[in-house]
UniProtKB/Swiss-Prot annotation:
InterPro entries given in the database record: NADH_UbQ_OxRdtase_chain4L/K, NUOK/Mnh_C1-like
Catalytic activity, as annotated: a ubiquinone + NADH + 5 H(+)(in) = a ubiquinol + NAD(+) + 4 H(+)(out)
Localization, UniProt: Mitochondrion inner membrane
Matching PANTHER family: NADH-UBIQUINONE OXIDOREDUCTASE CHAIN 4L (PTHR11434:SF0), NADH-UBIQUINONE OXIDOREDUCTASE SUBUNIT ND4L (PTHR11434)
Enzyme Commission number(s) from the entry: 7.1.1.2
Gene: MT-ND4L
Listed name of the protein: NADH-ubiquinone oxidoreductase chain 4L
Length: 98
């Protein structure tokens, strides 16, 4: 495993650990998800370029489209929750609370 792959893998693991540890605020969860998507995009792009996979060259762009949709939905949910409750706590998203 080259140093580039190791650094990208460490970036993904760091974002995943941040997502698992800092779950109280929605904004920090969204930032960790964006870090995971960025590291996946870079890993896919480097792998496709190194192995000369011409058929899979559209895959990173499709991943970026899904990441943009995820970011837009997450930010709209953040605005809705912060306008409704005044905070961005993830516990406000629980529908079973009264």
């Amino acid at each position: 495993m080259t140093m580039v792959y190791a650094n990208i893998f460490l970036a993904f693991i760091t974002s995943l650990m941040g997502l698992l540890m800092y779950r109280s605020h929605l904004m920090s969860s969204l930032l960790c998800l964006e870090g995971m998507m960025l590291s996946l995009f870079v890993m896919m792009t480097v792998t496709i370029l190194n192995n000369h996979f011409t058929l899979a060259s559209m895959t990173p762009i499709i991943l970026l489209v899904f990441a943009a949709c995820e970011a837009a939905l997450g930010l709209s949910l953040l605005v809705m929750v912060s306008n409704t409750y005044g905070t961005d706590y993830v516990q406000n998203l629980n529908l079973l609370q009264c």
